[in-house]
Amino acid sequence: MLDTANKKLLGRIILTALVVVTLIVAPYTLTDPMGLPKLSMLAFFAVVALSLVLPAIKALFRSEFRTLVILLTLFILQIILVLFLSGADLGAQFYGAYTRNNGALAYFALAVLLFSSSLVSDKEFVKRFIRIVLIIGAILIIYGNIQYLGLEPFPYKTLYTVNAPIGTFGNSNFQSAFMGLIATVAMTMALNTAFKVLVRLGFATMGLASIVVIYETLSSQGYLNFLAGLALVAILWLIIHGRKTLAMAAAGLALMGGGLVFLALFNLGPLARFIFEASVASRLYYWWAAAKMLIDHPFFGVGMDGYGTWYLRYREAAMNKGFSTYTNSAHNVFADIATSGGVVLVTIYCAIAVLVILSIVRIIRRKDGFDPYFLATVGAWFAWHVQSFVSINQLGLAIWGWLLSGLIIGYEINTRVKETGQVLPTKIKHTGKKAKVSVQLLSSKSIISLFAGVLIGALIAIPPYYVHARFFTALYSSDLKAVESATYLRPIDERRLSHGASMFIGNERQSEAIAILRDGTARYPDSHDLWSIWAGIQAASASDIATARAQMRRLDPFNPGWK
């Protein structure tokens, strides 16, 4: 097991990772200023955390954490199998789709951070966590209002509503969902009668401010996950205070409300006129396409983050027009995981969620009294999962769901251990009248492991960021030689190849564009972007155009433009 020094450092790493991954953006260095920097930081902190955990992994397999260790090990092993057996490009699977970055690296990092958070979770750490949550929430409430007022300091462009807050997530739906989570935490903290009235009013005000930002986003996701999270908190509060009849009644009302919301997704029931809209309708098509992918690829899916590569082949013919013509996500985290890694991967993911639920039940049964910090954590976890049913796994949000899961599982285990007296006592050094807690330093073995973790983490995190930053600089320099050089920097990815080819086409250098497209389609034969660009080049040979159009008919069979 981890010693005190390692555990404290691991806790700091987790909290730092949460802050950095949520807030980091890179607007002046990348064409993808939101997704890629979050992936780089997520990977870096996960590897550093792993360097502290790995030396104790054998002991953890024999500890109370063994169920979680086994589930996460199976999850990672299935991802490794998918990488080699799904048939998709290894590089594309490792880093994930452009702007989404939900590849093997991201899920490995999320799994490591979930486990790490479970090791450090206890009553004191959960308090620290909730305080950090509220600070991040306050930052994004302020930033969201700055964006709403048209005072955005960064040169972002959105395809959605003008001035709708996007926070540090790149999409108003994500900002809305995150504000729903923050509102849940703030309102739960306001329930604590141990706080002074002014403090409780402050929490309630923060919750209301979060709801105001949800309104500004013009996205209903935040309302739904806030109501769901707060409803669960209210039910658990009633159970804790012995009001089981009221709790059952509240649970019944919550289930009825949830059922009406579910019907509204299909344009049915009294709530349909408030919830159902074009973007909701399109999600039904996305989910149906995901289901068909899973049926045809049940064991290893279509490859990590490969939904976009296959979507056009599985979409309904009715979806060949409008903004929903193409998507690279099922807009449902469970469906995205299922299509990425098959039935096994999504089953393990569901098993982790079940383990969280069992942990919540066990803690509530202990009748330890009202702990607002724990209930806020549970409410936030449930709010996150509600939004995950209709949203994309944006890494700035994804880290919250995985860390919250680890915190709840670890809280149950670590407080259980403490109750049975199995926790090692803190070493106390008595000097005179006052007792001083001795400071434990990292062992030499831990320092070496940590140094290796920082080095390896940097080696994994920096390359994708570096090559995309070089490409961004080359694009804005209009130096075609620099563009060509940056296009082929490793790790190579499909989007840089398509951007590079488009740059040459725009400068009437079609032969160079064709050379890039030839290389690109050899590496990514299922790339819709590369083949469609090639099919539109007038200087291409008739046979090349015919080949490109034939490939587009294969990749986009319901598009009448390729008939």
What function would you assign to each model-found segment?
Residues 117, 171, 284-327, 334-337, ...:
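TM-adjacent membrane-interface loops and short helices in multi-pass inner/ER membrane proteins
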Residues 265-278, 443-481, 495:
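Hydrophobic alpha-helical transmembrane segments in integral membrane proteins
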Residues 443, 451-453, 475-563:
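C-terminal luminal/periplasmic domains and tails of membrane-associated envelope-modifying transferases
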